[in-house]
Curated annotation (Swiss-Prot):
GO terms for biological process: 'de novo' IMP biosynthetic process. Belongs to the PurH family. It comes from Burkholderia mallei (strain ATCC 23344). HAMAP family: PurH (MF_00139). The keyword Transferase applies. The IMP cyclohydrolase activity resides in the N-terminal region. Residues 1-145 form the MGS-like domain. NCBIfam families: PRK00881.1 (NF002049), purH (TIGR00355). It holds the Pfam family MGS. This is Bifunctional purine biosynthesis protein PurH.
Length: 521
């Protein structure tokens, strides 16, 4: 039974109401510093830990709760007579509920003007020590580190005479160990990122020791293939607008491949300002378009490759209305993603319960790093978030692109970044016309892209082409021009750039270079 609680929190969200409810249940309250003052100001009967232990806070608050009367009351096993006799001999009451959260270390180091001294002062010592003590003794002590658990704890206490069941205590304890591990990981990441000058402003983005923290969202039926097991984890610091923030409105459970393809679709569609639609198959765009609204964008995107769109993942950057929903519902779709769905659109899909509908709020955030496992190691790089602006382009041919061609080139370049290398993308009038992806030679990607357009009955006359990396020879350029392209955008940087540019002039097409490569593997 919970008779006495110790409360010491940095995040004071909801703590006064929680403490009031505990007091109403007859629980004695112990507290420290600012938390004790807050509770006392709210009219609650609270005992300062310094008065409880008979030992004052010292060293500017560095030593407050590191005392046998605190830790003895937390760590004593109630089922061991010798433990209880020791408490009685030393006049130590049990502490049955511990409510603690930690100094805001992560928030402190996120500030531009943070110093090493600031960071060090925000490394909590007493808090993690109490948390780990209580979590270790979770059989007898309830420990709460997350304000979101206050209501759960109160409800169970009220229902069971101030007592919580073992499963609840165990769950709360595992949450504590995860929290303290993440806290220590953040400290290690920061301290090992500092250079020889130990200056906050010159720290490395890649610490000497890298700790990553993810929380499991769900187990998956299987992995990329049925014989592989899998689970989906969410970054503890999930950025705004990220796929992991999805809310599923209907449909079957997401699979491993659903999630991977949905991420590719969502990241691509977010980059467009105009209403856009992206159709993904095996992590590659098979149709991308912008339009006056979601319905028009979908109709154009679907034209690119209706065959590959079968069973695809579709993402919109605008609300899906009834008209767009009716158009999409005519096809077999695995997952549909949008910032929102109108009520009428939801009714359309209610008749297709296997279609997974995901709502994700649009946001500018993205992952800080891109991670790739290799045998025995991990590759870590910054995200490829570079979007080339018109002023950064350099025309290298005698003929300059027309304004329309420039619009098509920028659209094509934006799509090419999300196509597996080697990537060749034909575009025109705000839509993809042919996509060549994942080939070992660039010329083969060019041929495949033109064949795709032919199969879809789309003309490439006057089209724009984007290549994710430079043309190593003129052969790839010759293929796209023969197919009908009149302008090309590519990074440049080949030892044969002069030969490729000369070929472009020979064909009287416009070519611009970005100086930026977009390999995607």
């Amino acid at each position: 039974m919970i008779k006495q609680a110790l409360i010491s929190v940095s995040d004071k969200t909801g703590i006064v109401d929680f403490a009031k409810a505990l007091s109403a249940l007859g629980v004695k309250l112990l507290s420290t510093g600012g938390t004790a003052k807050l509770l006392a100001d709210a009219g609650l009967p609270v005992t300062e830990v310094a008065d409880y232990t008979g030992f004052p806070e010292m060293l500017d608050g560095r030593v407050k709760t590191l005392h046998p009367k605190v830790h003895g009351g937390i760590l004593a096993r109630r089922d061991l007579p010798e433990h209880m006799q020791a408490l009685e001999a030393h006049g130590i009451p049990t502490i049955d509920l511990l409510v603690v959260n930690l100094y805001p270390f992560v928030q402190t180091i996120a500030k531009d003007d943070c110093t090493l001294a600031d960071a060090i002062e925000n490394i909590d010592i007493g808090g993690p020590t109490m948390l780990r003590s209580a979590a270790k003794n979770h059989r007898d002590v309830t420990v709460v580190v997350d304000p979101a658990d206050y209501a759960v704890v109160l409800d169970e206490m009220k229902a069971n005479g101030n007592t919580l069941g073992y499963k609840t205590n165990f769950r709360l304890a595992t949450k504590v160990f995860a929290h303290t591990a993440q806290y220590d990981g953040a400290i290690t990441n920061y301290l090992t990122s500092l250079g020889d000058d130990l200056q906050h402003g010159s720290r490395s983005a890649y610490p000497a020791t890298l700790n990553l923290a993810f929380d499991k969202v769900q187990d998956l039926r299987y992995g990329e293939n049925p014989h592989q097991s899998a689970a989906f984890y969410r970054d503890v610091a999930t950025p705004a607008g990220a796929l992991a923030n999805y809310r599923q409105l209907q449909g079957k459970e997401l699979s491993y491949n659903n999630i991977a393809d949905s991420d590719a679709a969502w990241e691509c569609v977010k980059t467009f300002d105009a209403p856009a639609c992206v159709i993904i198959k095996h992590a590659n765009p098979c149709g991308v378009a912008v339009g006056a609204d979601a319905g028009e964008a979908y109709a154009k995107a679907f034209q690119t490759d209706p065959t590959s769109a079968f069973g695809g993942i579709i993402a919109f950057n605008r609300e899906v209305d009834e008209a767009a929903a009716q158009a999409v519902a005519k096809q077999f779709v695995e997952v549909l993603i949008a910032p929102s769905f109108s009520d009428a659109a939801k009714q359309v899909f209610a008749a297709k319960q296997n279609v997974r509908l995901l709502e994700i709020a649009l946001g500018e955030g993205h992952n800080a790093f891109d991670l790739k496992r290799v045998g025995g190691g991990l590759l870590v790089q910054s995200l490829d978030s570079k979007n080339v602006q018109p002023r950064e382009l350099r025309v290298v041919t005698k003929r300059h692109p027309t304004p329309k061609e420039m619009d098509d080139l920028l659209f094509a370049w934006r799509v090419a970044k999300y196509v597996k290398s080697n990537a060749i993308v034909f575009c025109g009038n705000g839509m993809t016309l042919g996509v060549g992806a994942g080939q070992m030679s660039r010329v083969d990607s060019a041929r495949i892209a033109s064949i795709k357009a032919q199969n879809a009955g789309l003309t490439l006359a006057g089209s724009a082409v984007a290549s994710d990396a430079f043309f190593p020879f003129r052969d790839g350029l010759d293929v796209v021009v023969a197919a009908g392209a009149t302008c090309v955008i590519q990074p440049g940087g080949s030892v044969r750039d002069d030969e490729v540019i000369a070929a472009a002039d020979e064909h009287n097409i416009a070519m611009v270079v970005t100086g930026v490569r977009h390999f995607r593997h």
